[in-house]
Curated annotation (Swiss-Prot):
SUPFAM superfamilies cross-referenced by the UniProt entry: Epsilon subunit of F1F0-ATP synthase N-terminal domain
Subunit structure: F-type ATPases have 2 components, CF(1) - the catalytic core - and CF(0) - the membrane proton channel. CF(1) has five subunits: alpha(3), beta(3), gamma(1), delta(1), epsilon(1). CF(0) has three main subunits: a, b and c.
Pfam families cross-referenced by the UniProt entry: ATP-synt_DE, ATP-synt_DE_N
One GO MF term: proton-transporting ATP synthase activity, rotational mechanism
Encoding gene per record: atpE
Subcellular compartments: Plastid thylakoid membrane
Keyword Transmembrane: no
Highest taxon above the source species: Eukaryota
Protein name: ATP synthase epsilon chain, plastid
Family label: Belongs to the ATPase epsilon chain family.
Membrane topology term: Peripheral membrane protein
CDD domains: F1-ATPase_delta
Gene3D superfamilies, per database record: 6.10.140.480, F0F1 ATP synthase delta/epsilon subunit, N-terminal
Amino acid sequence: MTLKLCVLTPNRIFWDSEVEEIILSTNSGQIGILPTHTPIATSVDIGILRIRLNGRWLTMALMGGFARIGNNEITVLVNDAERSSDIDPQEAQQTVEIAEANFRKAKGKRQKIEANIALCRARTRVKAVSPISVGK
């Protein structure tokens, strides 16, 4: 038995196919979803989406949103998504360093919040390409 996974960003259908299992980062922690999962709606955190397809794990970086699970269908609406295979590890690490510097320099509540979000996004991209996350 499989699950139908659809990941949507504002600009495109990012993923639309059958999968065996997923592990999704939510605001209350990671959840594993297998066929016949209890129906739920949840917020999606800036974090990693792991997809098991044909016995192998794929890793993606998700940039926050919402998910609906029910009847062996998962619909994930996110601000942005990126496959680990599309991320340049060196560029991702440089982005973290820039985001950390911007976070340290941030003044005022709004700047600190925006800098923190940018840092979370940058760290998620690095995590998506780390050997432990990729799961080869």
